[in-house]
A protein has these predicted regions:
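Low-complexity, intrinsically disordered Gly/Pro/Thr-rich segments
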Residues: 238-242, 246-254
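Short, intrinsically disordered/low-complexity patches at protein termini
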Residues: 94-95, 223-225, 253-254
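Catalytic-core "active-site belt" of small-molecule-metabolizing enzymes
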Residues: 2-209, 251, 259-267
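A short pocket-lining beta-strand/turn micro-motif at the edge of beta-sheets
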Residues: 225, 230-233, 250-252, 260-262
């Protein structure tokens, strides 16, 4: 386990990498003894640093929700990160690609809470009861650490991603909000178009068998830290497509069927 000073030092390095748009070496290469607990401690330090600068916590994200992604990361559960106020982008926006380092798009559903949600023993039924509405969402993910180390060619590990706020960089909400019991959430599907070509398709059941399962998992995961999910918070439930890279000039349109669509362009 790393000490608090080291957690803070790493958090400042990640913060500088985000601001300068220059990736740093994977943390797991600099600190091979790092643990999952260390990685979340670094993430908390980084989020605290941003809040001290005036940012506001607006919710949370859940990542690594598919079995394939968990296996590739050598973990057996998802990860999570924080959503801050400056991460939210309007549907239909022109997004400066220079705001990010290596941006990618993921297709998700967002749960907007009406009631507090607290673990342990939180279930999918508690999530339904606490949710005000569910709305289509795109997550913009980024990497402040190298995916592959330029010197050793070693790939980054899950410790690096968790420390890096679970790779979160932006959120776009759009389409039509629905009440939790309005549709069978498992069967909500989406088509992701990049420049008019379908690049990814997916169905929401790909997220832990049901997209609300991730929200329950998060409430239970945060309970030991005496943290609950608060009314008004936005929870990204996890991606049901693979991430698609975004470059300058790319236009994205994601069609959620009768739940509407979300669009953006990178400039």
């Amino acid at each position: 386990m790393l000490d608090k000073h080291t957690h803070t030092l790493i958090a400042h390095r990640l913060h500088q990498a985000e601001q300068s748009r220059e990736q740093i070496r994977a943390i797991s290469l600099e600190y091979p003894e790092i643990t999952i607990e260390d990685a979340y401690a670094v993430q908390r330090e980084w989020v605290s640093l941003k809040i001290a600068e005036g940012r506001v916590l607006k919710g949370h994200k859940i990542g690594l929700t598919s079995k394939a992604m968990q296996a590739s990361s050598q973990i057996s559960e998802p990860d999570y990160g924080a959503l801050l106020d400056d991460m939210f982008i309007h549907d239909g926006s022109d997004i400066p690609v220079d705001r990010f380092i290596v941006p990618r798009i993921e297709v998700e559903l967002a749960f907007v809470l009406a009631k507090p949600l607290r673990g342990p023993n939180c279930t999918i039924f508690d999530v339904y009861n606490a949710t005000d509405y569910i709305i289509p969402a795109l997550e913009l993910i980024d990497a402040r650490c190298h995916n592959v180390d330029p010197e050793t060619q070693r790939p980054r590990k899950v410790f690096d991603t968790i420390s890096d706020n679970a790779a979160n960089a932006g959120v776009i909400l759009g389409g039509r909000p629905i009440k939790p019991d309005e549709l069978d959430l498992r069967w909500i599907s989406a088509l992701l178009y990049r420049n008019g070509v379908i690049e990814e398709t997916g169905v929401a059941a790909g997220v832990l068998n049901h997209p609300a399962n991730g929200v329950a998992w998060l409430a239970n995961k945060l309970a030991p830290y005496d943290v609950q999910l608060e009314p008004g918070q936005i929870i990204l439930g996890g991606s049901f497509t693979r991430p698609v890279a975004a470059s300058r000039g790319d236009t994205f349109h994601v069609d959620y069927g009768n739940m509407g669509s979300i669009s953006c362009r990178f400039v």
